[in-house]
Amino acid sequence: MSSLYVPLVLRLEVRDRTKIVQSFIDDSKAGSESPLAGERTRQRLVKKGNTPPKKELKGREEDPPIGVMSSEPSHNYHKGRRTYSEVVIESLDGEKLVDSSSSVAGTSEKSGGRSVSEGPPDQVAYYSGNPLTEKTEGIMHFYKYNDEKLTKVAQCRMLCMYAVPAQVEVREIISFMCISLPMIVSIKVVRDPAPNQYMLIIKFKEHNDAVTFYEEFNNCPFNDLESYCCTLFFVDRIECTTSNDLFSSDDTSLTELPTCAVCLERMDDSVLAILCNHSFHARCLEQWADNTCPVCRYVQSPEVVAEQRCNDCGMSNDLWICLICGNIGCGRYAEQHAQRHWELTSHTYSLKVGGERVWDYAGDNYVHRLIENGADGKLVEYQRESNASFDDKNQKGGDKLEGIKLEYTLLLTSQLEDQRKYFEGLRHDMEQTMSKMEKTAYAQVENLEHQLTERSTELKSLKGDLDDTVTARKVAEKRATQTNEKVNKLANELKDEREINQMLRKDQQVWKGQVEKLIESQKTARTEYEKKIEDLQSQVNDLLMHFETQNKLKEQLDAGKITQEEITESQVELDSSSSSSRKLNRKKKK
Protein backbone atom coordinates (compact mmCIF):
# COMPACT_ATOMS: atom_id res chain seq x y z
CA MET A 1 0.00 0.00 0.00
CA SER A 2 2.92 2.33 -0.48
CA SER A 3 2.12 5.54 -2.30
CA LEU A 4 3.01 9.18 -2.30
CA TYR A 5 1.55 11.60 0.21
CA VAL A 6 -2.03 10.29 0.35
CA PRO A 7 -3.42 10.76 3.88
CA LEU A 8 -5.97 8.18 4.96
CA VAL A 9 -8.62 8.04 7.66
CA LEU A 10 -8.84 4.92 9.84
CA ARG A 11 -12.29 4.19 11.24
CA LEU A 12 -13.06 1.37 13.67
CA GLU A 13 -16.66 0.19 13.38
CA VAL A 14 -17.78 -1.55 16.57
CA ARG A 15 -20.88 -3.59 17.11
CA ASP A 16 -24.01 -1.81 18.29
CA ARG A 17 -24.44 -1.52 22.05
CA THR A 18 -20.70 -2.00 22.42
CA LYS A 19 -18.43 0.34 24.32
CA ILE A 20 -16.55 2.85 22.18
CA VAL A 21 -12.76 2.50 22.35
CA GLN A 22 -11.70 5.94 23.55
CA SER A 23 -8.01 5.33 22.88
CA PHE A 24 -8.81 4.93 19.20
CA ILE A 25 -10.21 8.45 18.87
CA ASP A 26 -7.37 10.76 17.92
CA ASP A 27 -6.92 13.65 15.52
CA SER A 28 -3.32 14.31 14.53
CA LYS A 29 -4.02 17.82 13.23
CA ALA A 30 -2.00 20.41 15.12
CA GLY A 31 -4.61 23.10 14.63
CA SER A 32 -2.71 25.08 11.98
CA GLU A 33 -3.14 23.87 8.43
CA SER A 34 -1.05 25.15 5.56
CA PRO A 35 -2.60 25.05 2.08
CA LEU A 36 0.73 24.04 0.58
CA ALA A 37 1.94 21.62 3.26
CA GLY A 38 0.64 18.51 1.51
CA GLU A 39 2.03 19.60 -1.85
CA ARG A 40 5.46 20.30 -0.35
CA THR A 41 5.44 16.90 1.32
CA ARG A 42 4.48 15.23 -1.95
CA GLN A 43 7.31 16.97 -3.83
CA ARG A 44 9.73 16.06 -1.07
CA LEU A 45 8.82 12.39 -1.27
CA VAL A 46 9.08 12.43 -5.07
CA LYS A 47 12.58 13.92 -4.90
CA LYS A 48 13.66 11.33 -2.33
CA GLY A 49 12.39 8.52 -4.56
CA ASN A 50 11.06 6.63 -1.53
CA THR A 51 8.14 5.01 -3.24
CA PRO A 52 8.74 1.75 -5.08
CA PRO A 53 8.37 1.80 -8.87
CA LYS A 54 5.00 0.77 -10.11
CA LYS A 55 4.80 -1.97 -12.68
CA GLU A 56 3.61 -0.57 -15.97
CA LEU A 57 0.66 -2.31 -17.63
CA LYS A 58 0.38 -2.75 -21.45
CA GLY A 59 -2.57 -1.01 -23.07
CA ARG A 60 -2.98 1.75 -20.35
CA GLU A 61 -0.94 4.84 -19.45
CA GLU A 62 -2.23 5.53 -15.92
CA ASP A 63 -3.93 3.58 -13.19
CA PRO A 64 -7.64 4.29 -12.90
CA PRO A 65 -8.82 6.22 -9.85
CA ILE A 66 -9.58 4.19 -6.77
CA GLY A 67 -13.02 4.09 -5.30
CA VAL A 68 -14.56 6.90 -7.34
CA MET A 69 -17.89 7.78 -5.79
CA SER A 70 -20.65 10.07 -6.86
CA SER A 71 -20.49 13.57 -5.52
CA GLU A 72 -24.20 13.48 -4.70
CA PRO A 73 -24.98 12.25 -1.20
CA SER A 74 -26.51 8.81 -1.14
CA HIS A 75 -28.05 7.02 1.83
CA ASN A 76 -28.76 3.71 0.13
CA TYR A 77 -26.15 1.86 2.14
CA HIS A 78 -26.56 -1.83 2.83
CA LYS A 79 -24.67 -3.56 5.58
CA GLY A 80 -24.79 -6.90 3.85
CA ARG A 81 -23.23 -9.87 5.57
CA ARG A 82 -20.95 -8.32 8.18
CA THR A 83 -18.80 -10.35 10.54
CA TYR A 84 -17.55 -8.60 13.64
CA SER A 85 -14.35 -10.03 15.04
CA GLU A 86 -12.25 -9.32 18.08
CA VAL A 87 -10.02 -6.25 17.81
CA VAL A 88 -7.28 -5.72 20.41
CA ILE A 89 -5.73 -2.26 20.77
CA GLU A 90 -2.60 -1.84 22.87
CA SER A 91 -1.34 1.70 23.58
CA LEU A 92 2.34 2.47 24.23
CA ASP A 93 3.67 5.81 25.44
CA GLY A 94 6.63 7.18 23.49
CA GLU A 95 8.33 8.82 26.48
CA LYS A 96 8.16 5.62 28.50
CA LEU A 97 9.64 3.72 25.60
CA VAL A 98 12.53 6.19 25.45
CA ASP A 99 13.05 5.98 29.22
CA SER A 100 12.90 2.20 29.24
CA SER A 101 15.38 1.94 26.40
CA SER A 102 17.78 4.44 27.95
CA SER A 103 17.55 3.06 31.50
CA VAL A 104 18.20 -0.58 30.75
CA ALA A 105 21.92 -0.20 31.32
CA GLY A 106 21.57 1.89 34.48
CA THR A 107 18.96 -0.19 36.27
CA SER A 108 21.45 -2.02 38.44
CA GLU A 109 23.22 1.20 39.44
CA LYS A 110 19.96 2.84 40.57
CA SER A 111 18.95 -0.21 42.54
CA GLY A 112 22.36 -0.39 44.20
CA GLY A 113 22.29 3.27 45.21
CA ARG A 114 19.07 3.01 47.27
CA SER A 115 19.53 3.63 50.95
CA VAL A 116 19.47 0.51 53.08
CA SER A 117 17.72 2.36 55.87
CA GLU A 118 14.64 2.96 53.73
CA GLY A 119 11.85 0.59 54.58
CA PRO A 120 8.97 -0.69 52.51
CA PRO A 121 6.30 1.88 51.60
CA ASP A 122 3.11 2.08 53.66
CA GLN A 123 0.77 2.07 50.66
CA VAL A 124 1.25 0.54 47.22
CA ALA A 125 -1.06 1.36 44.31
CA TYR A 126 -2.18 -1.53 42.17
CA TYR A 127 -4.75 -2.22 39.46
CA SER A 128 -6.39 -5.25 37.99
CA GLY A 129 -5.86 -6.09 34.35
CA ASN A 130 -3.93 -4.15 31.74
CA PRO A 131 -5.25 -0.60 31.30
CA LEU A 132 -3.15 -0.15 28.15
CA THR A 133 -4.97 -2.92 26.31
CA GLU A 134 -8.59 -2.69 25.18
CA LYS A 135 -10.70 -5.32 23.46
CA THR A 136 -13.79 -4.90 21.36
CA GLU A 137 -15.64 -6.44 18.44
CA GLY A 138 -15.57 -4.52 15.21
CA ILE A 139 -14.32 -4.02 11.67
CA MET A 140 -11.45 -1.79 10.57
CA HIS A 141 -12.13 0.56 7.63
CA PHE A 142 -9.67 2.60 5.56
CA TYR A 143 -10.84 5.78 3.84
CA LYS A 144 -9.26 8.35 1.54
CA TYR A 145 -10.34 11.88 0.68
CA ASN A 146 -12.27 12.46 -2.52
CA ASP A 147 -11.28 16.12 -2.69
CA GLU A 148 -7.67 16.82 -3.65
CA LYS A 149 -7.76 20.07 -1.69
CA LEU A 150 -8.23 18.19 1.59
CA THR A 151 -5.24 16.06 0.71
CA LYS A 152 -3.06 19.08 0.03
CA VAL A 153 -3.87 20.93 3.26
CA ALA A 154 -3.58 17.87 5.54
CA GLN A 155 -0.51 17.82 7.82
CA CYS A 156 -0.41 14.24 9.01
CA ARG A 157 1.35 13.50 12.27
CA MET A 158 0.48 9.80 12.25
CA LEU A 159 1.77 6.86 10.24
CA CYS A 160 0.31 3.38 9.94
CA MET A 161 2.73 0.47 9.71
CA TYR A 162 0.52 -1.91 7.80
CA ALA A 163 0.63 -5.72 7.54
CA VAL A 164 3.38 -6.38 10.06
CA PRO A 165 3.93 -10.15 10.05
CA ALA A 166 3.27 -12.01 13.27
CA GLN A 167 6.81 -13.38 13.20
CA VAL A 168 8.10 -9.87 13.92
CA GLU A 169 7.33 -8.98 17.54
CA VAL A 170 6.61 -5.50 18.88
CA ARG A 171 9.90 -5.32 20.74
CA GLU A 172 11.71 -6.01 17.47
CA ILE A 173 9.76 -3.16 15.87
CA ILE A 174 10.75 -0.83 18.71
CA SER A 175 14.41 -1.77 18.36
CA PHE A 176 14.03 -1.38 14.59
CA MET A 177 12.96 2.26 14.96
CA CYS A 178 14.84 3.08 18.17
CA ILE A 179 16.57 6.05 16.51
CA SER A 180 13.24 7.80 15.98
CA LEU A 181 11.74 7.10 19.42
CA PRO A 182 12.33 10.69 20.69
CA MET A 183 10.07 11.94 17.88
CA ILE A 184 7.21 9.56 18.76
CA VAL A 185 4.35 10.53 21.05
CA SER A 186 2.52 7.20 21.20
CA ILE A 187 2.20 3.85 19.46
CA LYS A 188 -1.02 1.85 19.10
CA VAL A 189 -0.75 -1.85 18.29
CA VAL A 190 -3.95 -2.99 16.54
CA ARG A 191 -4.62 -6.69 16.12
CA ASP A 192 -7.63 -7.27 13.89
CA PRO A 193 -8.99 -10.51 12.36
CA ALA A 194 -6.35 -10.44 9.60
CA PRO A 195 -4.46 -13.74 9.97
CA ASN A 196 -0.78 -13.75 10.94
CA GLN A 197 -0.38 -9.98 10.89
CA TYR A 198 -1.07 -6.81 12.83
CA MET A 199 -0.52 -3.09 12.37
CA LEU A 200 0.92 -0.16 14.29
CA ILE A 201 -0.37 3.42 14.41
CA ILE A 202 2.52 5.75 15.26
CA LYS A 203 1.84 9.33 16.32
CA PHE A 204 4.68 11.89 16.04
CA LYS A 205 5.26 15.27 17.62
CA GLU A 206 5.49 17.19 14.34
CA HIS A 207 4.48 16.67 10.74
CA ASN A 208 8.10 16.84 9.57
CA ASP A 209 9.00 14.04 12.00
CA ALA A 210 6.41 11.80 10.34
CA VAL A 211 7.74 12.64 6.87
CA THR A 212 11.32 11.97 7.97
CA PHE A 213 10.32 8.64 9.49
CA TYR A 214 8.47 7.73 6.27
CA GLU A 215 11.53 8.55 4.16
CA GLU A 216 13.88 6.50 6.33
CA PHE A 217 11.86 3.37 7.07
CA ASN A 218 9.33 2.89 4.25
CA ASN A 219 10.02 -0.33 2.29
CA CYS A 220 13.00 -1.13 4.52
CA PRO A 221 13.40 -4.73 5.76
CA PHE A 222 12.92 -5.30 9.47
CA ASN A 223 16.11 -7.35 9.67
CA ASP A 224 18.71 -8.91 7.43
CA LEU A 225 17.52 -12.48 7.90
CA GLU A 226 13.92 -12.16 6.70
CA SER A 227 12.41 -10.58 3.61
CA TYR A 228 9.57 -8.77 5.42
CA CYS A 229 9.57 -5.04 4.71
CA CYS A 230 8.11 -2.08 6.54
CA THR A 231 5.02 -0.69 4.77
CA LEU A 232 3.94 2.81 5.82
CA PHE A 233 1.21 5.24 4.83
CA PHE A 234 0.07 8.55 6.26
CA VAL A 235 -2.97 8.78 8.55
CA ASP A 236 -4.84 12.03 9.00
CA ARG A 237 -7.06 10.86 11.87
CA ILE A 238 -8.46 7.75 13.53
CA GLU A 239 -12.06 7.32 14.62
CA CYS A 240 -14.24 4.83 16.47
CA THR A 241 -17.96 4.64 15.74
CA THR A 242 -20.86 2.22 15.78
CA SER A 243 -22.38 0.63 12.71
CA ASN A 244 -25.59 2.67 12.96
CA ASP A 245 -23.68 5.94 13.21
CA LEU A 246 -21.44 4.88 10.33
CA PHE A 247 -24.26 4.19 7.89
CA SER A 248 -26.38 7.14 8.97
CA SER A 249 -23.63 9.72 8.47
CA ASP A 250 -23.81 12.18 5.56
CA ASP A 251 -20.04 12.42 5.07
CA THR A 252 -19.40 12.16 1.31
CA SER A 253 -15.85 13.48 1.41
CA LEU A 254 -14.42 10.03 2.15
CA THR A 255 -14.24 6.88 0.05
CA GLU A 256 -13.47 3.51 1.57
CA LEU A 257 -10.53 1.68 0.07
CA PRO A 258 -11.60 -1.69 -1.33
CA THR A 259 -9.96 -4.97 -0.45
CA CYS A 260 -8.26 -7.09 -3.08
CA ALA A 261 -10.12 -10.38 -3.45
CA VAL A 262 -6.88 -12.23 -4.23
CA CYS A 263 -4.42 -11.12 -1.54
CA LEU A 264 -7.04 -9.71 0.90
CA GLU A 265 -5.01 -6.50 1.37
CA ARG A 266 -6.20 -2.92 1.11
CA MET A 267 -5.83 -1.39 -2.34
CA ASP A 268 -4.17 2.00 -2.55
CA ASP A 269 -1.98 1.96 -5.66
CA SER A 270 -1.44 -0.29 -8.68
CA VAL A 271 -5.19 -0.90 -8.81
CA LEU A 272 -6.75 -2.40 -11.91
CA ALA A 273 -10.52 -2.24 -12.48
CA ILE A 274 -11.98 -4.67 -15.02
CA LEU A 275 -15.25 -4.65 -16.97
CA CYS A 276 -17.37 -6.11 -14.16
CA ASN A 277 -16.28 -3.20 -11.90
CA HIS A 278 -14.30 -5.47 -9.55
CA SER A 279 -10.92 -4.08 -8.52
CA PHE A 280 -7.69 -5.96 -7.89
CA HIS A 281 -4.01 -5.29 -7.50
CA ALA A 282 -2.36 -5.43 -10.90
CA ARG A 283 0.22 -7.93 -9.66
CA CYS A 284 -2.53 -10.16 -8.23
CA LEU A 285 -4.58 -10.14 -11.42
CA GLU A 286 -1.51 -10.98 -13.50
CA GLN A 287 -1.13 -14.23 -11.55
CA TRP A 288 -4.70 -15.27 -12.36
CA ALA A 289 -4.45 -17.94 -15.06
CA ASP A 290 -8.09 -17.79 -16.20
CA ASN A 291 -9.55 -14.99 -18.32
CA THR A 292 -12.62 -14.59 -16.11
CA CYS A 293 -13.06 -12.44 -13.04
CA PRO A 294 -12.31 -14.54 -9.93
CA VAL A 295 -15.04 -12.81 -7.90
CA CYS A 296 -17.69 -13.27 -10.61
CA ARG A 297 -16.62 -16.84 -11.08
CA TYR A 298 -16.92 -17.58 -7.37
CA VAL A 299 -20.27 -15.82 -6.94
CA GLN A 300 -22.05 -16.69 -10.17
CA SER A 301 -20.70 -20.11 -11.14
CA PRO A 302 -22.55 -22.91 -9.29
CA GLU A 303 -20.82 -26.10 -8.31
CA VAL A 304 -20.85 -28.78 -10.96
CA VAL A 305 -22.96 -31.66 -9.68
CA ALA A 306 -22.32 -34.89 -11.51
CA GLU A 307 -25.63 -36.49 -12.48
CA GLN A 308 -25.65 -40.27 -12.11
CA ARG A 309 -26.73 -42.10 -15.27
CA CYS A 310 -26.57 -45.62 -16.57
CA ASN A 311 -23.33 -46.23 -18.43
CA ASP A 312 -25.15 -48.11 -21.21
CA CYS A 313 -28.54 -46.49 -21.77
CA GLY A 314 -28.19 -43.17 -19.94
CA MET A 315 -31.19 -43.68 -17.65
CA SER A 316 -31.15 -41.52 -14.52
CA ASN A 317 -33.58 -43.47 -12.26
CA ASP A 318 -33.51 -46.95 -10.70
CA LEU A 319 -29.72 -47.10 -10.79
CA TRP A 320 -27.43 -49.65 -9.14
CA ILE A 321 -23.68 -49.25 -8.67
CA CYS A 322 -21.31 -52.20 -8.57
CA LEU A 323 -19.46 -52.44 -5.25
CA ILE A 324 -16.41 -53.97 -6.97
CA CYS A 325 -15.67 -51.76 -9.96
CA GLY A 326 -18.12 -48.86 -9.57
CA ASN A 327 -20.05 -49.54 -12.78
CA ILE A 328 -23.49 -47.88 -12.84
CA GLY A 329 -26.37 -49.73 -14.48
CA CYS A 330 -30.14 -49.64 -14.50
CA GLY A 331 -32.26 -52.10 -12.49
CA ARG A 332 -34.25 -55.13 -13.53
CA TYR A 333 -37.40 -53.07 -13.95
CA ALA A 334 -35.66 -51.03 -16.67
CA GLU A 335 -33.09 -52.26 -19.20
CA GLN A 336 -31.36 -54.60 -16.65
CA HIS A 337 -27.87 -53.34 -17.48
CA ALA A 338 -26.73 -53.86 -13.87
CA GLN A 339 -27.64 -57.57 -14.10
CA ARG A 340 -25.91 -57.87 -17.49
CA HIS A 341 -22.81 -56.40 -15.89
CA TRP A 342 -22.97 -59.20 -13.27
CA GLU A 343 -23.35 -61.81 -15.99
CA LEU A 344 -20.29 -60.47 -17.81
CA THR A 345 -18.00 -59.78 -14.85
CA SER A 346 -19.39 -61.99 -12.06
CA HIS A 347 -19.50 -58.96 -9.76
CA THR A 348 -22.19 -60.12 -7.38
CA TYR A 349 -23.01 -57.10 -5.22
CA SER A 350 -24.64 -53.86 -6.30
CA LEU A 351 -25.69 -50.89 -4.17
CA LYS A 352 -28.84 -48.90 -4.79
CA VAL A 353 -27.83 -45.37 -5.87
CA GLY A 354 -29.26 -42.94 -3.33
CA GLY A 355 -30.23 -45.75 -0.93
CA GLU A 356 -28.69 -48.25 1.47
CA ARG A 357 -29.78 -51.53 -0.06
CA VAL A 358 -27.26 -54.05 -1.41
CA TRP A 359 -28.42 -56.78 -3.83
CA ASP A 360 -26.71 -60.14 -4.19
CA TYR A 361 -27.19 -61.45 -7.74
CA ALA A 362 -25.78 -64.88 -6.86
CA GLY A 363 -28.17 -65.41 -3.94
CA ASP A 364 -30.92 -63.33 -5.55
CA ASN A 365 -31.64 -61.47 -2.31
CA TYR A 366 -30.68 -58.40 -0.28
CA VAL A 367 -27.57 -58.61 1.90
CA HIS A 368 -27.42 -55.07 3.27
CA ARG A 369 -28.76 -56.22 6.66
CA LEU A 370 -25.58 -58.13 7.51
CA ILE A 371 -23.19 -55.81 9.28
CA GLU A 372 -20.19 -56.34 11.53
CA ASN A 373 -20.52 -55.79 15.25
CA GLY A 374 -18.17 -53.10 16.54
CA ALA A 375 -17.54 -54.91 19.85
CA ASP A 376 -16.42 -58.38 18.75
CA GLY A 377 -16.26 -58.05 14.95
CA LYS A 378 -19.10 -60.54 14.39
CA LEU A 379 -21.74 -60.25 11.70
CA VAL A 380 -25.16 -59.21 12.92
CA GLU A 381 -28.44 -58.55 11.17
CA TYR A 382 -29.20 -54.87 10.80
CA GLN A 383 -32.64 -53.43 10.29
CA ARG A 384 -32.54 -49.65 9.84
CA GLU A 385 -35.39 -47.84 11.56
CA SER A 386 -36.02 -44.15 11.64
CA ASN A 387 -36.34 -43.87 15.45
CA ALA A 388 -33.95 -46.65 16.51
CA SER A 389 -31.34 -45.75 19.07
CA PHE A 390 -27.67 -46.64 19.14
CA ASP A 391 -28.21 -49.09 22.01
CA ASP A 392 -30.82 -51.05 20.06
CA LYS A 393 -28.37 -51.43 17.21
CA ASN A 394 -25.73 -53.03 19.42
CA GLN A 395 -28.18 -55.42 21.13
CA LYS A 396 -29.21 -57.28 17.96
CA GLY A 397 -25.93 -59.15 17.58
CA GLY A 398 -25.35 -62.61 18.98
CA ASP A 399 -23.30 -65.72 18.89
CA LYS A 400 -25.77 -67.44 16.56
CA LEU A 401 -24.46 -65.40 13.60
CA GLU A 402 -21.00 -66.98 13.71
CA GLY A 403 -21.88 -69.23 10.81
CA ILE A 404 -23.28 -66.33 8.88
CA LYS A 405 -19.99 -64.51 9.37
CA LEU A 406 -18.05 -67.51 8.07
CA GLU A 407 -20.39 -67.85 5.13
CA TYR A 408 -20.04 -64.16 4.40
CA THR A 409 -16.25 -64.45 4.60
CA LEU A 410 -16.21 -67.38 2.18
CA LEU A 411 -18.57 -65.53 -0.12
CA LEU A 412 -16.38 -62.46 -0.01
CA THR A 413 -13.30 -64.60 -0.70
CA SER A 414 -14.96 -66.22 -3.69
CA GLN A 415 -16.03 -62.83 -4.96
CA LEU A 416 -12.52 -61.51 -4.58
CA GLU A 417 -11.19 -64.55 -6.45
CA ASP A 418 -13.70 -63.95 -9.23
CA GLN A 419 -12.71 -60.32 -9.18
CA ARG A 420 -9.04 -61.29 -9.48
CA LYS A 421 -9.79 -63.55 -12.44
CA TYR A 422 -11.86 -60.84 -14.04
CA PHE A 423 -9.19 -58.20 -13.68
CA GLU A 424 -6.50 -60.64 -14.81
CA GLY A 425 -8.59 -61.23 -17.92
CA LEU A 426 -8.91 -57.50 -18.38
CA ARG A 427 -5.17 -57.15 -17.92
CA HIS A 428 -4.53 -59.91 -20.48
CA ASP A 429 -6.88 -58.24 -22.94
CA MET A 430 -5.25 -54.92 -22.21
CA GLU A 431 -1.79 -56.43 -22.76
CA GLN A 432 -2.88 -57.87 -26.08
CA THR A 433 -4.41 -54.57 -27.05
CA MET A 434 -1.29 -52.73 -25.97
CA SER A 435 0.85 -55.22 -27.93
CA LYS A 436 -1.23 -54.61 -31.04
CA MET A 437 -1.09 -50.90 -30.46
CA GLU A 438 2.67 -51.13 -29.91
CA LYS A 439 3.13 -53.01 -33.17
CA THR A 440 0.93 -50.51 -34.93
CA ALA A 441 2.87 -47.69 -33.33
CA TYR A 442 6.17 -49.24 -34.41
CA ALA A 443 4.87 -49.58 -37.97
CA GLN A 444 3.66 -46.01 -37.90
CA VAL A 445 7.00 -44.87 -36.51
CA GLU A 446 8.87 -46.73 -39.25
CA ASN A 447 6.55 -45.25 -41.84
CA LEU A 448 7.06 -41.82 -40.36
CA GLU A 449 10.83 -42.34 -40.32
CA HIS A 450 10.72 -43.38 -43.98
CA GLN A 451 8.62 -40.34 -44.80
CA LEU A 452 10.97 -38.21 -42.76
CA THR A 453 13.96 -39.57 -44.72
CA GLU A 454 12.21 -38.83 -48.01
CA ARG A 455 11.25 -35.38 -46.80
CA SER A 456 14.83 -34.80 -45.67
CA THR A 457 16.12 -35.78 -49.12
CA GLU A 458 13.56 -33.52 -50.76
CA LEU A 459 14.49 -30.79 -48.36
CA LYS A 460 18.18 -31.14 -49.21
CA SER A 461 17.44 -31.01 -52.94
CA LEU A 462 15.17 -28.05 -52.40
CA LYS A 463 17.89 -26.37 -50.38
CA GLY A 464 20.35 -26.98 -53.26
CA ASP A 465 17.84 -25.60 -55.74
CA LEU A 466 17.26 -22.71 -53.42
CA ASP A 467 20.99 -21.99 -53.23
CA ASP A 468 21.26 -22.14 -57.03
CA THR A 469 18.22 -19.92 -57.33
CA VAL A 470 19.68 -17.48 -54.84
CA THR A 471 22.98 -17.42 -56.76
CA ALA A 472 21.16 -16.94 -60.07
CA ARG A 473 19.04 -14.27 -58.50
CA LYS A 474 22.14 -12.46 -57.28
CA VAL A 475 23.72 -12.68 -60.76
CA ALA A 476 20.49 -11.51 -62.36
CA GLU A 477 20.25 -8.68 -59.86
CA LYS A 478 23.84 -7.71 -60.65
CA ARG A 479 23.14 -7.77 -64.37
CA ALA A 480 19.92 -5.91 -63.87
CA THR A 481 21.82 -3.33 -61.85
CA GLN A 482 24.41 -2.93 -64.61
CA THR A 483 21.68 -2.80 -67.24
CA ASN A 484 19.83 -0.20 -65.23
CA GLU A 485 23.01 1.84 -64.96
CA LYS A 486 23.52 1.62 -68.74
CA VAL A 487 19.89 2.45 -69.37
CA ASN A 488 20.17 5.43 -67.05
CA LYS A 489 23.37 6.52 -68.80
CA LEU A 490 21.81 6.15 -72.26
CA ALA A 491 18.70 7.93 -71.05
CA ASN A 492 20.84 10.82 -69.88
CA GLU A 493 22.73 10.87 -73.19
CA LEU A 494 19.46 10.69 -75.12
CA LYS A 495 18.18 13.55 -73.09
CA ASP A 496 21.30 15.57 -73.84
CA GLU A 497 21.04 14.73 -77.57
CA ARG A 498 17.42 15.74 -77.62
CA GLU A 499 18.27 19.00 -75.95
CA ILE A 500 21.07 19.60 -78.49
CA ASN A 501 18.77 18.72 -81.39
CA GLN A 502 16.13 21.03 -80.03
CA MET A 503 18.68 23.81 -79.78
CA LEU A 504 19.93 23.08 -83.31
CA ARG A 505 16.39 23.15 -84.63
CA LYS A 506 15.84 26.48 -83.01
CA ASP A 507 19.12 27.77 -84.51
CA GLN A 508 18.17 26.28 -87.90
CA GLN A 509 14.90 28.14 -87.91
CA VAL A 510 16.69 31.33 -86.97
CA TRP A 511 19.35 30.90 -89.67
CA LYS A 512 16.77 29.89 -92.24
CA GLY A 513 14.86 33.09 -91.61
CA GLN A 514 18.07 35.06 -91.84
CA VAL A 515 19.00 33.36 -95.18
CA GLU A 516 15.57 34.10 -96.61
CA LYS A 517 15.96 37.70 -95.54
CA LEU A 518 19.43 37.81 -97.16
CA ILE A 519 18.10 36.30 -100.41
CA GLU A 520 15.29 38.82 -100.57
CA SER A 521 17.64 41.67 -99.79
CA GLN A 522 20.09 40.32 -102.43
CA LYS A 523 17.34 40.19 -105.05
CA THR A 524 16.30 43.73 -104.22
CA ALA A 525 19.91 44.93 -104.34
CA ARG A 526 20.54 43.10 -107.65
CA THR A 527 17.52 44.76 -109.22
CA GLU A 528 18.69 48.12 -108.02
CA TYR A 529 22.24 47.43 -109.23
CA GLU A 530 20.98 46.35 -112.64
CA LYS A 531 19.02 49.58 -112.96
CA LYS A 532 22.06 51.58 -111.92
CA ILE A 533 24.25 49.66 -114.38
CA GLU A 534 21.85 50.36 -117.26
CA ASP A 535 21.81 54.04 -116.41
CA LEU A 536 25.58 54.12 -116.18
CA GLN A 537 25.89 52.18 -119.46
CA SER A 538 23.64 54.65 -121.23
CA GLN A 539 25.66 57.47 -119.79
CA VAL A 540 28.88 55.81 -121.00
CA ASN A 541 27.42 55.37 -124.48
CA ASP A 542 26.39 58.97 -124.55
CA LEU A 543 29.86 59.99 -123.48
CA LEU A 544 31.44 57.79 -126.16
CA MET A 545 29.20 59.23 -128.82
CA HIS A 546 29.97 62.68 -127.53
CA PHE A 547 33.68 62.03 -127.71
CA GLU A 548 33.42 60.41 -131.14
CA THR A 549 31.37 63.25 -132.49
CA GLN A 550 33.72 65.74 -131.00
CA ASN A 551 36.68 64.02 -132.67
CA LYS A 552 34.96 63.93 -136.02
CA LEU A 553 34.03 67.55 -135.80
CA LYS A 554 37.54 68.39 -134.80
CA GLU A 555 38.91 66.48 -137.78
CA GLN A 556 36.52 68.14 -140.16
CA LEU A 557 37.28 71.46 -138.57
CA ASP A 558 40.94 70.83 -139.06
CA ALA A 559 40.36 69.71 -142.60
CA GLY A 560 38.37 72.79 -143.24
CA LYS A 561 35.31 71.05 -144.26
CA ILE A 562 33.22 72.65 -141.54
CA THR A 563 33.58 75.99 -139.97
CA GLN A 564 33.19 76.96 -136.35
CA GLU A 565 30.03 78.86 -137.02
CA GLU A 566 28.41 75.89 -138.61
CA ILE A 567 29.27 73.77 -135.66
CA THR A 568 27.76 76.31 -133.32
CA GLU A 569 24.58 76.74 -135.31
CA SER A 570 24.18 73.08 -136.28
CA GLN A 571 21.86 70.59 -134.56
CA VAL A 572 22.60 66.97 -134.20
CA GLU A 573 19.78 64.40 -134.46
CA LEU A 574 20.06 60.79 -133.63
CA ASP A 575 17.93 58.10 -135.12
CA SER A 576 15.96 55.87 -132.93
CA SER A 577 17.17 52.84 -134.83
CA SER A 578 20.72 53.63 -134.06
CA SER A 579 19.95 54.05 -130.36
CA SER A 580 18.04 50.77 -130.23
CA SER A 581 20.78 48.95 -132.09
CA ARG A 582 23.22 50.30 -129.60
CA LYS A 583 21.13 48.95 -126.75
CA LEU A 584 21.02 45.52 -128.38
CA ASN A 585 24.74 45.62 -128.91
CA ARG A 586 25.19 46.43 -125.26
CA LYS A 587 23.04 43.46 -124.24
CA LYS A 588 25.01 41.13 -126.47
CA LYS A 589 28.23 42.34 -125.03
CA LYS A 590 26.95 41.55 -121.65
From Swiss-Prot:
Zinc finger (UBP-type): 294-386
One Pfam family hit: zf-RING_2
GO MF: ubiquitin protein ligase activity; zinc ion binding
Subcellular location: Cytoplasm
Region called Disordered, residue ranges: 27-80, 99-124, 568-590
Catalytic activity annotation: S-ubiquitinyl-[E2 ubiquitin-conjugating enzyme]-L-cysteine + [acceptor protein]-L-lysine = [E2 ubiquitin-conjugating enzyme]-L-cysteine + N(6)-ubiquitinyl-[acceptor protein]-L-lysine
One Gene Ontology term, aspect cellular component: cytoplasm
Keyword field: Cytoplasm, Metal-binding, Stress response, Transferase, Ubl conjugation pathway, Zinc, Zinc-finger
Binding residue positions for Zn(2+) 2: 322, 325, 341, 347
Function: Acts as a Ras responsive E3 ubiquitin ligase. Controls the stress response to increased levels of reactive oxygen species (ROS) by modulating the brc-1-dependent expression of cki-1. Modulates expression of phase II detoxification genes such as gst-4, gst-7, sdz-8 and ugt-13, in a transcription factor skn-1-dependent manner.
Identification of the protein by name: BRCA1-associated protein homolog 2
Organism annotation: Caenorhabditis elegans
Higher taxonomy: Eukaryota, Metazoa, Ecdysozoa, Nematoda, Chromadorea
